[in-house]
Every structure is written in structure tokens, then in C-alpha cells.
């Protein structure tokens, strides 16, 4: 009988502590991981709202400029996903190019930065991510990629492409990618479909 009462008292104390004790605050690493996950969610929010691929040059407001939500190119998926975390690549890329123009690819016969288009060009994004220590190793191991990572490729025709790793998985465990390669923002099993040239993680774990 005494043993039963002692056990009951112990369970009561444990239950009381479990219900009333404050939650352990998240660590900085956990907060950063959640932010990376939110980048993936920011990309996911574009599925069904970004419906067209449209590479037209557009005059944008600065900072915070964007083309109409229903259209865009592959880089716009990344730009909008990061904006969901209050990261403005238009501003960041423009400011870095203004100070270090020669460090960026000279592919477009420009003499100075152009805040309307520079951040929408994949090679410029690759350069910015690399210059700001966002790079991760490229590999064929699916477990090396987490939701919110940004990956760039060279397509079979040589064109640059970029997308956001989602929190979804293919049947074989490969992370899916949210990207726009012609039909608006889509979530597809394309992580290892082309030659990967860049792997980036904005919020380091």
C-alpha cells in the first residue's frame, strides 16, 4: 500500500512538472533551421500563384521590386522565397555589384549595375552566394540537402537554372525542388536531373 502511494505521488509530481514547466527556448541553430524551412515554405507559396515563365526585362521599384506574382523566371522563385524571410536579394546583389562590379560575370555587356535585372540572373546569384559564404558542397547524396537550400545547375543546353529544395521527397527519398522552368512554380523531382554547379544555404546551421 505504501509503495502504491509513493508511486502515485511520484507520478503526480512528474505530471505536474511536465505540464507547468516552461518550454525550453529554441537554440540559435534551431531558429536558423526553422528559417531555412521557412524559405522552402516561401517557395511553396508560389505554387499555384506563379503560373507562367516570362523572362521579359521589367522596370522594377528599388528596393523590394518584383515582377507580377503570376509570372517570372527561375530566379524569381528564389528571390520571393528569401523575401518571405525579409532577405531582399535585389538590394543585396545591387549593393555588392556597385562596390565590386568586376567580381561579377561580364556576360551582358553592361558598364554598371542594373537593379532591374542583375539579381534575376542566375550567374549573379551564384556569385553573390559564393562571395557571402553561403556555399555548401555539391554531392549526389540526397541527405546532404535540406529544405530551404538553394541549388543551381547547367541544363543540357548550357543555360543556367536555379531552384529551392522543398520539404517534400520523392519515393526514393530524394528531396524535391520548387522551381520555374517553363510552366510557373512547380514542385518536382529534379535535384539530380542536370549538372549541379551550386549548392547554397542562406542560414548556416
Task: Identify the residue ranges that each predicted region occupies.
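Sec-dependent signal peptide recognition
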Residues: 2-8
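Low-complexity, Gly/Ser/Thr/Pro-rich intrinsically disordered linker/tail segments
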Residues: 172-205
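Sec-exported extracytoplasmic/periplasmic mature domains
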Residues: 44, 48, 79-87, 94, ...
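...with weaker cross-activation on analogous glycine-rich loops/strands in unrelated enzymes
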Residues: 37-40, 98-178
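Bacterial Sec-dependent signal peptides at the C-terminal "C-region" and cleavage site
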Residues: 10-30
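Acidic helix-start/capping segments at beta-turn-to-alpha-helix junctions
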Residues: 54-75, 88-112
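Second-shell loop/turn segments in exported
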Residues: 25-32, 60-69, 111-115, 136-140, ...
Amino acid at each position: 500500500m505504501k509503495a502504491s502511494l509513493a508511486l502515485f505521488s511520484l507520478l503526480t509530481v512528474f505530471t505536474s512538472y511536465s505540464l507547468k514547466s516552461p518550454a525550453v527556448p529554441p537554440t540559435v541553430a534551431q531558429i536558423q533551421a526553422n528559417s531555412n524551412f521557412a524559405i522552402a515554405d516561401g517557395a511553396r507559396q508560389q505554387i499555384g500563384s506563379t503560373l507562367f515563365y516570362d523572362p521579359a526585362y521589367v522596370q522594377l521599384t528599388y528596393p523590394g521590386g518584383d515582377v507580377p506574382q503570376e509570372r517570372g523566371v527561375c530566379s524569381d522563385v528564389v528571390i520571393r522565397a528569401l523575401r518571405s524571410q525579409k532577405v531582399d536579394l535585389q538590394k543585396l546583389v545591387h549593393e555588392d555589384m556597385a562596390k565590386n562590379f568586376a567580381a561579377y560575370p561580364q556576360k551582358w555587356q553592361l558598364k554598371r549595375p542594373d537593379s532591374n535585372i542583375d539579381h534575376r540572373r542566375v550567374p549573379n546569384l551564384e556569385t553573390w552566394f559564393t562571395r557571402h559564404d553561403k556555399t555548401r558542397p555539391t554531392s549526389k547524396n540526397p541527405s546532404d540537402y535540406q529544405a530551404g537550400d538553394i541549388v543551381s545547375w547547367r541544363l543540357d543546353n548550357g543555360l543556367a537554372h536555379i531552384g529551392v529544395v522543398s520539404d517534400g521527397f520523392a519515393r526514393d527519398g530524394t528531396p524535391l525542388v520548387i522551381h520555374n522552368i517553363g510552366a510557373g512554380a512547380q514542385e518536382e523531382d529534379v535535384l539530380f536531373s542536370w549538372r549541379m554547379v551550386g549548392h547554397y544555404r542562406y542560414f548556416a546551421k
